[in-house]
Amino acid sequence: MVQQLQKSMSDGMATTAAAVPMNANGVDTGKVPTAPPDVFFSTENEPEDCTPVKMDPFDRPKSDKDPVEDAIERLLKVMEKIDCPYTPGKEKGVDQDESDDMTESEDHDEMAKDDEGIPANEVRVETRKMDCTTGQLVAPRIYEKVDTLSSTSESSAEEDESMMIIKEGIRVCYGVWKKRQKNSEMALKGLAIVLELCLTQPSARDEIFSVLLETLGFNTVTYWKAVVPQVVDSDLTYATQYREALLFSMCLYDVNHSKNRLRELYAAIPGFRQSMLGIRAKQFTERYRHLQMKIARSRQSSRMSSKYGSEDNIQAMVTLANDVIMDEETAPTQMPLVDMSHDKQRVINVSNAPPVSISRKTSGSWEIKQGSGGLVACVDPVMSADKKNIWLSNLGVNMQEELKEHSTTTNSIGLPLIKQACAGEVFCVLERNEKKELTPKQQAVESDMSLLSVLNTYNKHSYQLNPVVVNQDDYDTYYGGISNGLLWPALHNLPQFISPCYNDPEALREQWCAYVRVNYLFSINAARNSRAQDFIWIHDYHLMLCGQIMRSLEGSLDVSSIEEREGKQKESLQIGFFLHIPFQPPANFMTKYRTVGEPIVRALLRFTKVGFQTSRDRETFVKLVADHIKRTKIDYDSRLDRYTIEHDGFACSLGVFPVSIKIADFVNIAKNPQTVIEAEEIRKQIMGKCADGGQLFFSVERFDYTKGIAEKLRAWQRYFEKYPDRIGKDVLFQVAVTNRRSVESYRQYQDDVMALAELINQKFHSEQYPEWKPVIFETDGLPRSRLIAHYLAMDIGVVTPSKDGMNLVAKEMLVCNPTASLVLSTGAGTEVQLSNAQFYSEQEGKCYHRVEDIANTEAFADNFFAAATESKETRNKHGEKINQFLCVHDIDEWSDQFLDPKWTHEVISECEVKQLGQFYGLMNRTAQVRRQIVECVLKGLPIRPHFKFSLENAKVTRQANDSECTTLTSLETSCPEGTSKLTLEADEESGEEKGFKITYDIHDELSEMEKDLAFLSFIQSDEYENAEEFIKTIGSFYEGGPILFSEEVKQAAEMLQRGIHYNTFFTDRDGTLKSYACSYPTSVQPAYSAVIQAQFARRCATFCAIVTTAPLIHTGILEVATIPEGYYAYGASAGREWYLNPAQQFKDRSFSAVDLTLMNKVFELIEELLEKPEFRTFKWIGSGIQKHCGHITIAKQDVNGTIPARKVTRLHEQLVKIVNDFDPTGTTLTMRESDLDFKIYVKAKLKGRIFNKGHGIRLVKERLKPNMSKGSCLVCGDSESDIPMLEECLKLAGSKVYTIWVTRDQALQEKVSQLCERYSCTNIHYVTCPQVLLGAMAYATAHTLTNEKNRKADSYYDDSDTPMDQEDTPSKQQ
């Protein structure tokens, strides 16, 4: 094969040398060829590096040539051209740095071989094999292990050799390309050829694609930047579908390897995600809808100009996205502080089965009827509550064949094209063709269009039903094959019904690829239809990969994905999954079927919440995760009965949600007089042929091997053998609705069961009652009213599945007929629920007849007898008891609990705060929630309900009592009446400090939570655009009252407005923008404050910086700040260390690297010291432990003097020892002590001066070079430590400085005034508290109509200076 390809390669090179002139895309300038040319090379006489090789777009797939053979031929040409020809049996090429390769983790072991477990020289004969795609039996095949290993067919040998060539080609081309030297462009072409092969057959070439990705390693981003433009060019030029194939290939790789390599593609080509997911189209739609809402509100208040009343001028509206459109006569005096969207949360329901049944009438028109399945009954009430909800499912109308002519489905911004050249995917067609003579194919399209019309009509009167269209072959394999051939029996723990075709690893892999592809199509449809605030609800075992694929595709539909901030808030995308069937896989599921098992279990952990029918199923899943999935953290909250599993940076909540029925619907039908009459007729018709005292046993289910019908009939047969006196009396009415007859295992099972029923009827007769039959067996379904009539007619309901998720039939029976008895097997989820509720216990009584093992025919028969002979009084008592329980726990409770936003790990749950560590952990979680709130508000995204619940639960927590029980109280009520003092235990260790407590004044923490809750209410109201209303909201907490607050705010705002637009803005934090907290770790910036500061920085200033004495990290400003990056620079340690973003950080260079390294080692030892129980208290008091630039601070006492002197003395001794051990001569470190803390300094060569905030301003001026002599400068502070900052700004900006001070200290005010007077600065104002300053900033922001032109006009940098050069970018914080 290789020799033939090399010969054709040489022939191809000779032909190429005489190529005609080409344009930039490699196409003949005179005539467009029918197929694009192959790879083009320069002649041998042409210098190698004089002209770069032109990268052509991907070739159009050739129908007359095998894709693999074609790719290998072209790849061999490339290898020849880069002087690395392929030699069979010998590896040749360039060496490769192993450091560049990204290898797979150790937990992905090689899959077991097909012949594993077969002894040598033995023959395995497969007597029956089912083709899982068609459900048909195929001829038996004989596997001989010796022959298989010793000889290989010619075709498989060629495949192995082809794979070797491709792997070697990838390795060689990558090695040449990554060096960026001679032939690198040609080597890139070789890699592109391999990629093209993978994209032409993504499901079949996943192994090659994996090799390509793993070889590229950390150079993937660079590779995508080079080749994705060719992918796009190919799609646009030749109508290929490579972008879609690339997206699927990446998802398939991520699913199989538990990776997230798709983010590398997004990082390389930011517009790729927006284009493929239609994000720009969604953003346009959301913005337009939001503008319409704003217009409607403005019209209601009679402020809207009629010329904007029409929807025609969309472009004009979009340009006014941030403004309220009003009449010119009533021009706005303010603009919204933020621009929010108030679209309510929708439920995006995703299921394989549709909620409707679609059929075609004889006239050719389509008819849609409401479905009747269990899923529909469960979910339809939730979906019908809002017409904007969306249900995505497959309607059974799929693509029957591969389209020969491709056409693009979206334009460059992701909008669907109005006209589609090929309408095979009928639901992508949005416009009907003009009337003309139609071909048969076009007539089929017209017919499909009529279906689309019916769907549109359906959607007008109900929720939105959107079809997911897939390739029919893929669907058959996914549904009729792996879903029902493997997953269904496996999860029911019925391995005997698993198709033997899955013993072949290659067959399993092929069907697994189809399963992934269909899941991918459902996922991408859900992502394209979802908004940030929606809840996506995935159902059942068909779609278990959707959570992982959606997270790979979208990253997050919430805050972090918009800015591509990887690694933050991964769990913000709300995706729930509910498994309607059991989760009881066989013991070898994770080993024998590892290709399927591990990816499914890992994928389930990517959902936000996963619901199981029973605690038994959840426990099985948790154990499976613990045993087989590495690097997981499993927690259990007994109060909420919730497991939380963390894996790969994601967290998943696992709950038990027993599904139920809509009680009212069944009760109303059961009470209908017509139903009662029909029930009497049924009973008379059946039991009229029996002896007195006979009992009617009734059972109804799908004709499925999981329902235990065969075991039931065997037990029924044994029942009459064991209790012959019941012959002629009792009747079993069995309804088994036939389904899946196309699947061999189902057809065989159904035939065997019907034969058994016939055998029982032939075996047992009653001479006295000759018309009596022991079994009435029907295979047709019953309408609901007639089904309920049978429930009323029965004496005993029989529900005995081998395994079932819940089985709602048992609930339907006793809801409709509470006087009936119930025979229930432990395999039913309903039995687990009733058993957990104590309905089968010695204390509460045994309210039903439990079948422990349906395979135990003797015990099963005894259960029948016990039910038949049970007294009516006992039966009525037990039935009524269960009936009351079921009526309370109905379908509404099930959906409400699953959709409850409070039930998730993302919500701060009500917790017990007893110790210092618990209190600080709680405050840290509020910081995370507040950051999410701020990002949502600043981006105009809806506020999720769980934000409010989290803050409420943080404020209302459980305070432990002295007794064992705990009571639910709030933090403020935990404090003594009239105070905000909170007393907590210092630690839980025994010893001399046992019982030692510490008291905090948490007034600021409580007050800021109250303000944030008020802010959340305001921002979600219709008044959110009114900044003055927001200021009133803050003013309601002001100690002087809202009127005085408003007046003080306006006075401060007037001064701020005089200086707008500020060129520079420097401010202190604690005491200026944030009230002082009980300790620094709890001084979390409130959400409302962060929003005000961010919007002020965005609209009213150019360069903004917060200068603080706190450090950056290690209990520093970055840990308590909630403003997103990019709004403010942070000058920590009085401006000695600066942080703009992760790539821009710098610090004062007064310290040598050796001295700083010494201090870092000292800090690490002190951290270890404070982890010891004896000294742990010092982490939580005051400023805790902080690592500044140049010194370390360790708190030793709180303001109340709570810490015992002996404890402080021991800490001092340990600190002195650590310092002396590292610096025994005292030449580098020095230790100081104040009333509240210890400080360890590095002795710097500063000529005796103390570094202050003025030096920090000077440092940032030197490094970033802002031009402070032009434009206004705003300075805010509250203490003596801020005066050097003001003085430095006055030196640089003089009278253009505007300053606001938060102080009532007359002496401090006098110092500030005198300092400003010295520099002729008269722009001074004093306020009483940080909230007034924040209110003034909000007022000034809303009343200053700035735009981007103002910002561009600012003279931020000196004419001769530029921002920091790339090569001068400071290194990251050490």
Curated annotation (Swiss-Prot):
Residues 56-66, 86-95 have a biased composition (Basic and acidic residues). InterPro entries: Glyco_trans_20, HAD-like_sf, HAD_sf, T6PP_C, T6PP_helical. Keywords: Glycosyltransferase, Transferase. Residues 96-109, 1356-1368 have a biased composition (Acidic residues). One of its GO terms (biological process) is trehalose biosynthetic process. Coiled coil: none annotated. The keyword DNA damage does not apply. It catalyses: D-glucose 6-phosphate + UDP-alpha-D-glucose = alpha,alpha-trehalose 6-phosphate + UDP + H(+). The keyword Transferase applies. It is an enzyme of class 2 (transferase). Its EC number is 2.4.1.15. GO terms for molecular function: alpha,alpha-trehalose-phosphate synthase (UDP-forming) activity; trehalose-phosphatase activity. Residues 28-66, 86-117, 1352-1374 are annotated as: Disordered. It comes from the Eukaryota. In the N-terminal section; belongs to the glycosyltransferase 20 family. In the C-terminal section; belongs to the gob-1 trehalose phosphatase family. Catalyzes the production of trehalose from glucose-6-phosphate and UDP-alpha-D-glucose in a 2 step process. This is Alpha,alpha-trehalose-phosphate synthase [UDP-forming] 1. It comes from Caenorhabditis briggsae.
